[in-house]
Amino acid sequence: MKIILLGAPGAGKGTQAQFIMNKFGIPQISTGDMLRAAIKAGTELGKQAKTLMDAGQLVPDDLIIALVQDRVAQPDCEKGFLLDGFPRTIPQADALKAAGIGIDYVLEFDVADEVIVERMSGRRVHPASGRSYHVVYNPPKVEGKDDVTGEDLIIRADDKPETVLDRLKVYHTTTRPLVDYYQAEAKAGNTRYFRLDGTQPVEAVSRELDKILA
């Protein structure tokens, strides 16, 4: 079961990735985690990536694909894997295909931009503990204060409306075209494509995923 999750930041991919991993026992593969692990382990690919990153350059697709190939060959990926944050662009999707890494399911979490802005800009965090709240969906007992310590909650820079809108702009320009790409792949019989309504309650989305992947 090889899965790609698509959807804008704040569409609920992280929550459902956790559900899929627990339910089906497959690992989540994050390219960021892989890069950090390869650099820490001092592998050949890790050394190349570190040199580029130290120079402030982006790690090229061929290097990332080589890391993904290494990772999916590990024993814990025998039953499948969940790709998170990759591919982000059509050239990356093409490279994945050229590397012979087939994908069984592409799952898109569809949420309107204004809902994402409301979701993310309503988040509040207690910096010391990492506890998070939401002014609408999961409010603290006292507005602006952590339930446990009574200390002030903050809005992370990432959750400010202007930052969220910038991230959405990047998503629509670079990653959104993958929706059409993978729908075409599904029509050609190369994968199965499902669009889920990410505005539903978390449990409802999980139930739908369970049916799709069962």
Swiss-Prot record:
Binding site for ATP: G10, A11, G12, K13, G14, T15, R123, S132, Y133, Q200
EC number, UniProt record: 2.7.4.3
Region forming the signal peptide: none
Principal location class: cytoplasm
CDD domains in UniProt: ADK
Record Pfam families: ADK, ADK_lid
Location within or outside the cell: Cytoplasm
Biological process annotations from GO: AMP salvage
Subunit structure: Monomer.
Function: Catalyzes the reversible transfer of the terminal phosphate group between ATP and AMP. Plays an important role in cellular energy homeostasis and in adenine nucleotide metabolism.
Similarity-based family: Belongs to the adenylate kinase family.
Protein name as annotated: Adenylate kinase
Taxonomy of the source species: Bacteria, Pseudomonadati, Pseudomonadota, Gammaproteobacteria, Pasteurellales
